[in-house]
Every structure is written in structure tokens, then in C-alpha cells.
A protein has these predicted regions:
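Alpha-helical bundle segments enriched in helix-capping/polar residues
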Residues: 1-284
């Protein structure tokens, strides 16, 4: 009950903040590390038409970006920064963008639905998603043999306890659980930083599905693109609940899932399988 009440209160505060913040300068404060990470996507896609650092600083564009950044997600803020550093002078593209902004301004309810999805996707602290996406795609898939072995060890210990020797079986169960937890944290520590990016990619894809499910009429062209991408990458979001959500709410379900992950390594198995999928779908 307490968790449900706190989550509802948190959602109400988010909605209030989104409504009050529309059309107003962002009040968010940035650390030097956070701001540096935001610029990485632009630096990886810089071209001859980009605004150079001297001109950018002379125009005070850092302050402009900070005031505009109500994106509420890592991918959104990195792309906004890139848009400002690589201005598009094509009149048709600008008219299209202006119409999109006007449509959202006129449709407060639909706008709020989209904003809530962006908040749900969220920001990854102190890292650049674009950096880690490139790293994750280049990772080599690790074997899941040890993870499956830890599950079999626990299963064998339980069967031994129930059918052969309860006393000895209990000690085997303790040993199996200890082995599973120790190996879990050992392997999890090695890939923990990549988990953040993988979770974010999964949430981006799930967010795309949520946006298309809203069926907003003036987003027809974008919905078609998102649907195509979601279909091509649908295997990535399957059984995504096995991964950590990143939203630690203290709920009983999340606590039980944490224990399940430690004992069965299902999130590590899912992670290794996702690495192969990312490499296969690198073009997307």
C-alpha cells in the first residue's frame, strides 16, 4: 500500500511539473560531468557545417541549450544538443518542425502523454548513451554455460534434499545458493556499466511502442518509422522484464525479481543474448 501510494504521489508530481514547465525555460542544474556527456553524440557526428566551439561560446549557446532542454531523456537531450550544433537551414524541414511544435502546443493531453513516456525512458546519469551504444555493439557475446550450471546446481541440490538426504541436501542447497550469488556479482560487476545502456536501449524501444500505441494523428509519419524499427528489433524487448528496470521502487515484485536474478542469473543470460542481437541489428 505504501509503495502504491508513493508511486501515485510521484506520478502526480511529475504530471504537475510537466504541465507547469511547458513553454518555460528549464530549471535543471548540470554538473560538469553530465554536461560533457551530453555533447558526445554531436562530437561523433560533427561535420563541416557544425557550429565551432568558439562561435558556440561567443553566442552563449550553452545557456540556450540549458533553457531549452526539457527533453526528459538521455537520447532526447543528446539529440537536442546535436540539433543546435548542426543547424538545419532547409526551409521545408524547419516548417515541418514548426508545425509539429504547433500541433503539440494545441493538443495538451496528447503532449502530456508523450512527455510521460519520455520521463519513463529517463536519463542515464554520468554516461553518454551514444558512447555506450557503440561499445555494446562491439562487445563479444560471452558464454552462458556457467549461468545455466548455477541453476542446475541449485535444482540438483533441491532434488537431492527431497529424495536422498535432507540433512546433507540442506548443506548442498546452501553451497549452491552461495555459489550462484558469488558468481552472479562477479560477472555482474564486469558488465554493470553496459547494463545501463542496454536497459536504456530496451526502454527506448518499449517507449517507441507506447508512442505508436497512442495513435496520435499528426505523428503519422513518425509512427510508421517507429513501427518499422520496433518490428525489426522486437526480439530485443522480449522478456525485457528479466533486466533491471532502473526504477528501484521497493515493491515486493521488484525485490522478488532481484532474488530471482541472483539465484538464476536470468538477467545475465538475457544480457549475453542481447549482445548478439545488437551485433546482428547494428544498422538500426
Amino acid at each position: 500500500y505504501v509503495t502504491v501510494t508513493n508511486n501515485r504521489r510521484k506520478q502526480n508530481l511529475i504530471i504537475k511539473k510537466l504541465k507547469n514547465g511547458w513553454g518555460k525555460p528549464s530549471q535543471r542544474k548540470y554538473s560538469g560531468e553530465d554536461y560533457e556527456c551530453i555533447s558526445h553524440y554531436f562530437k561523433r557526428n560533427e561535420d563541416e557545417n557544425s557550429i565551432d566551439d568558439i562561435t558556440w561560446n561567443d553566442l552563449g549557446m550553452d545557456a540556450v541549450f540549458c533553457m531549452m532542454n526539457n527533453t526528459n531523456s538521455s537520447a532526447g537531450q543528446e539529440y537536442l544538443y546535436k540539433m543546435l550544433r548542426c543547424p538545419n537551414a532547409d526551409i521545408q524541414s524547419l516548417k515541418k518542425l514548426d508545425k509539429l511544435a504547433s500541433d503539440f502546443d494545441k493538443n495538451a493531453a496528447k503532449r502530456l502523454d508523450i512527455q510521460k513516456i519520455f520521463v519513463w525512458i529517463g536519463r542515464a546519469k554520468h554516461i553518454s548513451i551514444s558512447d555506450y551504444c557503440d561499445v555494446v555493439v562491439g562487445l563479444e557475446k560471452k558464454s552462458n554455460v556457467l549461468h545455466y550450471a548455477s541453476m542446475l546446481f541449485i535444482l540438483a541440490a533441491v532434488i537431492f534434499t527431497c529424495t536422498i538426504s535432507p540433512v546433507l541436501g540442506i548443506w548442498l542447497c546452501i553451497a549452491a545458493i552461495a555459489f550462484s550469488i558469488i558468481t552472479y556479482y562477479k560477472y555482474k560487476a564486469a558488465v554493470d556499466r553496459y547494463f545501463i545502456c542496454v536497459n536504456h536501449i530496451v526502454k527506448l524501444l518499449m517507449g517507441a511502442k507506447k508512442i505508436t500505441a497512442l495513435n496520435i494523428d499528426f505523428l503519422g509519419e513518425y509512427n510508421d518509422k517507429l513501427n518499422n524499427i520496433s518490428e525489426e528489433l522486437s526480439d530485443i524487448t522480449k522478456r525485457s522484464w528479466l533486466l533491471e528496470t532502473g526504477n528501484v521502487d521497493g515493491s515486493i515484485a521488484e525485490i522478488l525479481l532481484d532474488y530471482l536474478r541472483m539465484l538464476t542469473h536470468v538477467d545475465l543470460i538475457k544480457f549475453n543474448n542481447l549482445i548478439k542481437l545488437f551485433n546482428d541489428k547494428e544498422d538500426y
